[in-house]
Amino acid sequence: MLITFEGIDGAGKSTQIRKLQKLLIGAHIDSITLREPGGTEVAEKIRQILLESRHEISPIGELLLFSASRAELVQQVILPAIDNGTTVILDRFFDSTIAYQGYGREIDQVMLQTIITLSTFSLQPDITFYLDISPENALMRKFSEKSLPIAFDESELDRMERSGLDFFRKVRQGYLDIIHKNERRFVLLDALDDPQMIHKRIIASLKERFPVFSGIKTR
């Protein structure tokens, strides 16, 4: 089984992934948590190239690097884990590519889908949790500021995060369009809700859709 989490940086994906991972371990459900880009030796090196702010990368180059990292992760780790009955929890998958490179970088969608199919080996998530938040709120959360304007050191941002608010507004709209087209796969969550409440909604969705999670209890 493949469970994916999506959302712009600052939405709280990492928090929810940690909570889910801890719960599955406690319930003795075999699981593995991975991230994109990354997850293999080669993919982690690609991650460094993609996120280091000193690198200038063209939109197509960025797409191909993300896709190369994904292909390594899917073939070497994710598919073998799923074949062994392991539940895979993945921080970002191809929906990020559609939102970031397709909507944010405005890369042709037909070309995008071809590359996604190749890099994923046609693998689809069983369920995707999307944490929705505005870019403004995400940035405030990231730097623990209470109101705009936000004062911060841009050197603290990675290359993707420095793309600007307009870019992330496009990315967010991309995600919302993706959800509209794939409503059965997605669970839409308000990232500004209480983290524990979000966690409970995630578990409720898993229990509702998949019998393997029916015995899980949350506090």
From Swiss-Prot:
SUPFAM superfamilies membership: P-loop containing nucleoside triphosphate hydrolases
Entry keyword annotation includes Nucleus: no
Keyword Nucleotide-binding attached: yes
Top-rank taxon: Bacteria
UniProt function note: Phosphorylation of dTMP to form dTDP in both de novo and salvage pathways of dTTP synthesis.
Protein family: Belongs to the thymidylate kinase family.
Keywords, ordered alphabetically: ATP-binding, Kinase, Nucleotide biosynthesis, Nucleotide-binding, Transferase
EC number from the UniProt entry: 2.7.4.9
GO molecular function term, any single one: dTMP kinase activity
Catalytic activity: dTMP + ATP = dTDP + ADP
A Pfam family per the record: Thymidylate_kin
Residues annotated to bind ATP: G7, I8, D9, G10, A11, G12, K13, S14
Native organism: Chlorobium limicola (strain DSM 245 / NBRC 103803 / 6330)
Protein's name according to its UniProt entry: Thymidylate kinase
GO CC, any one term: cytosol
GO biological process, one term: dTTP biosynthetic process
